[in-house]
Each structure stands twice: as C-alpha cells, then as structure tokens.
Amino acid sequence: MTGGKPQFRIKRIYDAAGDEDGFRVLVDRLWPRSISKETARIDLWMKAVAPSDALRRQFHGNPDGWEAFLAAYAEELEREPARSAAAELRARLRSGAVTLLYAARDEAHNNAEALRRLLAAASS
C-alpha cells in the first residue's frame, strides 16, 4: 500500500487480529459461529452493508454464481441503508487502514471480497 491510494483489506474473522488491520469492521449480516466478541476484536459490526438474507442464501447455494452475486450486490449497495454504510466505510479509509472481516471459508469468493471490489470500483 505504499505510495498509492489506501485500499480496504479483507481478513477472516477467525484469523488473529494485527496492528496492521487498523479499523476492523465485520461485514456479515449474521454473527460468526464459535467466536466471542472479545476474541473477534472488532471495532464495528456493520450489518447494513452486508448482502441481504435472500442474496446471501442464493449465493451460498450457488458458489458458481459469483458474477451474478457481484451484480446483485452492487444493486443492493445503491439502496439505503447500504449506500450510507458504504459511504461511511470509504470515509473511514481516508483516516487509515480498514479491514473488512468475514466468516466464509472461501477466501476468494465471499461478501467482504465482493464489497472490497465494489467499493474500489465506485471510488475510481
């Protein structure tokens, strides 16, 4: 991240918190299983920016539908309260590192990765 525009980081909530994480935001709609709030060390749980329950269930049942999930999630982020929550995340990034936390096992296809991509696209 040196010299360029700050970027959102993503990390599984089950991974140890580090100083480099900066502001830690859980972006899942549901609290992750088998982890306490103390262990998670989150600064904010932002349910409003998470995919809707319907979209989450649809994607969970069809991991091959990544591109369709991205498109549907982008539409959701254009509506309130998700739009305001996304704007708050972008504002926090201007103040320092922001790590988007998620619980999914798939490190490449999850809502935090989708959110990171969509926020980056909206900022460029």
Where are these regions (language model features)?
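Residues lining hydrophobic/aromatic ligand-binding pockets adjacent to catalytic sites
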Residues: T2-S124
